[in-house]
Design a protein with these regions (language model features):
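Pre-Walker A (Motif I) flank of P-loop NTPase domains
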Residues: 2-4
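Conserved lysine of the Walker
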Residues: 15
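A glycine- and Lys/Arg-enriched "phosphate-lid" helix/loop adjacent to the NTP-binding pocket
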Residues: 100-168, 176
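Conserved nucleotide-sensing/catalytic segment adjacent to the nucleotide-binding pocket
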Residues: 45-73, 79-101
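The conserved Walker
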Residues: 11
């Protein structure tokens, strides 16, 4: 059975890099963050309603890649269940909506309640912020505030999770160790 591992955290905390590294290491695929594609195509001036479009696009992308992994029968050398690494989920959309607009679409909250994942990796803010055309929060105080919001969400839900921190190699090894433990 496919195990879905979601990587979340504030912007510029290495989520996409970690997803890509883990997918390569475990010989599987990863689901990128749909928001990047949407914002690159439509511009960085987004509305509350755009966030619902992004949320739906994220889940459509996740479902497409889930089908691809399930149909490919990707398994690692120990013949353990397949893995799918997901960069961003509806918790990220909830935090984004509430942080920017002070409210969240009901549809996003409904998806949080009904979707199931096997593990969360929460990326800490201890990496240097890297500027790109889509990032909004270069200041560490805001990023740490967002990190605490994500951590509170994970503490108050049932899916197991682990905080990922340190240098890039330390983060990668910590994530690999957590996933190997999950797969035993």
């Amino acid at each position: 059975m496919l195990k879905k591992i979601v990587i979340i955290g504030p912007e510029s905390t290495g989520k996409s890099t970690l997803c890509r590294q883990l997918a390569e290491y475990f010989h599987t695929q990863w689901c990128p963050e749909y928001a990047r594609e949407f914002l690159l195509k439509n511009g960085t001036k987004y509305s509350y309603d755009d966030l619902l479009v992004i949320a739906k696009g994220q889940l459509e992308l996740e479902e497409t890649i889930t089908r691809q992994v399930n149909h490919s029968g990707l398994q690692n050398e120990e013949n353990r269940p397949g893995l799918l690494f997901i960069d961003t989920d509806m918790y990220v959309m909830k935090v984004w909506c509430e942080f920017v607009f002070g409210k969240c679409h009901r549809w996003i909250l409904e998806q949080i309640a009904k979707r199931e994942y096997d593990y969360y990796l929460l990326c800490n803010t201890d990496l240097p912020w890297v500027k790109d055309e889509l990032r909004e929060y270069p200041d560490l105080i805001t990023r740490e505030k967002l990190f605490r919001i994500y951590k509170d969400l994970l503490i108050n839900q049932q899916t197991p999770w682990q905080e990922i921190k340190g240098t890039d190699p330390e983060r990668f090894q910590s994530a690999v160790d957590a996933i190997n433990a999950l797969m035993k």
